């Protein structure tokens, strides 16, 4: 399926020197602790909580509308500690997701309306289907598909998943154009 052009109003997005496109309607708390490595798209009404701990996002990632990215935490007898969140390259996070993972590898697709529980680890080349709720501290192995509530193994991905995700995220970035450039 060929992706059509996705047009956006240039005044509604900030484009950084490294090619990141961040919606002015998104909320980046503690922006000094948020690292976007380049050509990443953060769409409207997203929230990234860099005020809690460092958040690193790789290259060619897409975070769609109304998603929340926040670092994981652990409760101790003396309080709560937050830990850094690392997201790899070529990761696609659909609309209305809440991500509270410890780590998301590269070439990962998270479907619409998902909840990624506290301190989950999503390895490289995995897929989370729409409406999935992963319980805290779940580990999703490479080349697997998880779905349901609670999220459980439901299938495998082909060996070419890495190439497919590179293709999807790069083409999405190339087709995400300002209205004036058409």
From Swiss-Prot:
UniProt xrefs under InterPro entries: DCTN5, Trimer_LpxA-like_sf
Main localisation: cytoplasm
Origin: domain of life: Eukaryota
Pfam families linked: DCTN5
SUPFAM superfamilies: Trimeric LpxA-like enzymes
Cysteine pairings via disulfide bonds: none
Cellular component GO terms held in the UniProt record: centrosome; cytoplasm; kinetochore; nuclear membrane; nucleoplasm
Biological processes annotated in GO: aorta development; coronary vasculature development; ventricular septum development
Localization: Cytoplasm, Cytoskeleton; Chromosome, Centromere, Kinetochore
Keywords associated with the record: Acetylation, Centromere, Chromosome, Cytoplasm, Cytoskeleton, Kinetochore
Annotated positions of the N-acetylmethionine modification: 1
Function in brief: Part of the dynactin complex that activates the molecular motor dynein for ultra-processive transport along microtubules.
Family label: Belongs to the dynactin subunits 5/6 family. Dynactin subunit 5 subfamily.
Subunit structure comment from the entry: Subunit of dynactin, a multiprotein complex part of a tripartite complex with dynein and a adapter, such as BICDL1, BICD2 or HOOK3. The dynactin complex is built around ACTR1A/ACTB filament and consists of an actin-related filament composed of a shoulder domain, a pointed end and a barbed end. Its length is defined by its flexible shoulder domain. The soulder is composed of 2 DCTN1 subunits, 4 DCTN2 and 2 DCTN3. The 4 DCNT2 (via N-terminus) bind the ACTR1A filament and act as molecular rulers to determine the length. The pointed end is important for binding dynein-dynactin cargo adapters.
Protein name: Dynactin subunit 5
Encoding gene (name): Dctn5
């Amino acid at each position: 399926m060929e992706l059509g052009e996705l047009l956006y109003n240039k005044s509604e997005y900030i484009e950084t020197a490294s090619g990141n496109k961040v919606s002015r309607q998104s909320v980046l708390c503690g922006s000094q602790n948020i690292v976007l490595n380049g050509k990443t798209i953060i769409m409207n009404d997203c929230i990234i909580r860099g005020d809690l701990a460092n958040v690193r996002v790789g290259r060619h990632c897409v975070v769609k509308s109304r998603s929340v990215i926040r670092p994981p935490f652990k409760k101790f007898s003396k309080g709560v500690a937050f830990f850094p969140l690392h997201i790899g390259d070529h990761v696609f996070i659909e609309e209305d997701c809440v991500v509270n993972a410890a780590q998301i590898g590269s070439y990962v697709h998270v479907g619409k309306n998902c909840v990624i529980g506290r301190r989950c680890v999503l390895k490289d080349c995995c897929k989370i289907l729409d409406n999935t709720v992963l319980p805290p501290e779940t580990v999703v192995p490479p080349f697997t598909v998880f779905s349901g509530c609670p999220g459980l193994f439901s299938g495998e991905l082909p060996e070419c998943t890495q190439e497919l995700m590179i293709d999807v995220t790069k083409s999405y970035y190339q087709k995400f154009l300002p209205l004036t450039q058409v």
